A protein has these predicted regions:
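C-terminal motif of bacterial Sec signal peptides marking the signal peptidase cleavage site
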Residues: 14-17
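Short strand-turn motif at the edge of the Rossmann-like AdoMet-binding core
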Residues: 263
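Sec-dependent signal peptide hydrophobic core
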Residues: 5-11
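Positively charged n-region of N-terminal signal peptides that target proteins for export
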Residues: 1-4, 19
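Generic detector of ordered secondary-structure context
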Residues: 10, 39-40, 105, 338, ...
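Flexible, low-complexity junctional segments that flank or bridge functional domains
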Residues: 19-257, 266, 272, 282, ...
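Short conserved active-site loop signatures built around small residues
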Residues: 260
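C-terminal "post-core" interaction segments
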Residues: 242-245, 250, 255-257, 266-498
């Protein structure tokens, strides 16, 4: 957290008289400031009284200690952290500016590409940089860059054959990857090498659906029916229409088996996740519960509620199901909260027709309300009109605990990656784009055709000398962000709906 400091100037004042000139070298005392008049102090007080003392799931465990905090001594970020329960690894907050950027789907100061190294870089002796995913509106797309492309050079730096060999190379790369203009050299997935110059865009529009495909026998040998593939990065309220369009495509194609790829999905808006589960649920389940949320003793049972398949704001059930009879989820350590909740909500209904391929999920069984500051009625007039110019802070304290219709929660512990264990564990294949050649997708299709998963691909070392360097800047967010994972409900929306 960044702390603010006040710099005081010490002034020497020359006193002039008609008899002689003297100089007073004693500094004037710095003007006193009232810490209780600072914006952070006001926000801290509101956070404690209106949010943490009311909505926080562990309020009974922390209220007494929080009442003793001298909030005039804390920045807003430090105050938020100080108010959390000792075992809470999920609550977090962000600035209004950050919230606006995320919800608008605009990424600033980015090439619109996620770079990584292989999970098995040590075993493979391959410390090169690959594209994990690329947003459709990234300027690199027009040069043929896709997931699986290998970055072999940037301004003034040529990557060694087997990737980083020294910390100096890693430092240079991290320092200069955002240079603009930038000259890139990539080896594309088809083996072609391309070199081009691009200017860093002011922002990149995101599309949280990475892929929506229908596979048939022409795409994968042995398929006797169409199989849908849906890859979603995050649940965002502003992109629900995109989910609708994708599933209209699957329904038209007669899809009965679906591969749902949530490997990088850390959760998000509860309305968006409810929309997805309503499409995925087998026919005839409209109106059936998929999650029950319980609150602290101050709010329970009045705010405890159950969400139902196909029930939305108009309180009328909608049969949105496309008639699936088998679903394969691709998930990973990055799959958290709302994405885990979709899987958990379907478990009682699909039983052995629900499969999990990839790696153990994050393990986040709870959710948050979206709590804005300022939160007076005047501010909400702006928010409800889609104007967030007055928004300063957004808080996401844990407010409720989730279980499915059979009372089962998402597995969790005090360490990350403590969630659902896959039926078939497979590493992330970043050497191939999302599709039938990607190992996890191929594994699901193989199971559909043969009834069993294929053996793991053999990792062949390309380098007999283990002298490569891992770039810590590529560490996944679930490892670096102690409060990773979201299942979000808008507080004002909740008041009107439940």
């Amino acid at each position: 957290m960044k702390k603010l400091s006040i710099l005081s100037a010490i002034l020497s004042i020359a006193l002039i008289s008609c008899e002689k000139t003297t100089t007073n070298t004693d500094p004037k005392p710095a003007p006193k400031t009232d810490p209780e008049a600072s914006p952070d102090y006001k926000a801290n007080k509101y956070l404690r009284k209106e949010y943490m003392d009311v909505y926080y799931y562990w309020v009974n465990e922390v209220k007494e200690a929080n009442s003793k905090l001298d909030l005039s001594k804390y920045t807003i970020y430090d105050a938020f952290d100080a108010m959390l329960y000792k075992d809470d690894r999920w609550s977090w907050m962000e600035s209004g500016e950050s919230y606006i950027s995320t919800e608008s789907g605009e990424v600033k100061g980015s090439w619109g590409v996620s770079f990584v190294q292989r999970d098995d870089c040590k075993e493979a002796g391959d410390y090169n940089v690959y594209v994990r995913f690329v947003y459709p509106e990234s300027p690199l797309v027009r040069h043929g860059v896709t997931r699986g492309a290998k970055l072999t050079g940037i301004n003034g730096f040529v990557m060694p054959e087997h990737g980083f060999e020294s910390n100096e190379q890693v430092d240079y790369f991290n320092e200069h990857i955002q240079d603009s203009p930038q000259t890139f050299t990539f080896t594309l997935t088809d083996g072609e090498s391309v070199t081009f110059e691009e200017t860093l865009p002011r922002s990149v529009s995101t599309n949280f659906i990475f892929s929506e495909q229908v596979f048939d026998a022409d795409d994968f040998d042995g398929l006797t029916e169409p199989v849908g593939y849906f890859n979603l990065l995050s649940f965002k309220a502003g992109f629900i229409d995109d989910i609708d369009k994708a599933f209209a495509k699957f329904k038209k194609a007669g899809v009965k088996k679906m591969i749902v790829d949530l490997r990088y999905n850390g959760g998000g808006d509860s309305n968006a996740s409810q929309r997805l589960i309503s499409y995925l649920a087998p026919a005839g389940l409209e109106g059936k519960p998929y999650v029950t949320r319980s609150h602290n003793s101050l709010l329970a049972p009045s705010l405890d509620f159950t969400a139902y398949i196909g029930l939305f704001e108009n309180n009328k059930y909608s049969d949105m199901a496309i008639g699936l009879d088998e679903i394969f989820f691709i998930m990973d350590h990055s799959s958290a909260s709302a994405s885990e909740m979709v899987f958990n909500g379907l478990r009682p209904y699909l039983k052995d027709k629900l499969h999990l391929v990839g790696r153990q999920t994050y393990g986040k069984p709870n959710g948050m309300y979206i709590l804005f500051y300022p939160a007076d009625d005047e501010a909400y007039k702006y928010y409800n009109a889609g104007n967030y110019s007055k928004l300063e802070w957004v808080f996401y304290p844990i407010c409720f605990f989730n279980v499915n219709s059979e009372g089962e929660s998402i597995p969790y512990g005090q360490t990350t990656a403590s969630g659902f264990v896959p039926d078939n564990e497979r590493p992330d294949d970043i050497l191939h784009d999302f599709g039938v050649e990607e190992d996890r997708v191929k594994a699901c299709l193989t199971y559909i055709v043969t009834g069993s998963y294929p053996a793991l691909p053999v990792t062949k070392s390309t380098n007999s000398v283990s002298n490569g360097i891992e770039n810590k800047a590529f560490a996944p967010e679930w490892k670096t962000n102690p409060h990773y994972g979201t299942d979000l409900v808008n507080r004002r929306s909740l008041t009107e709906t439940f």
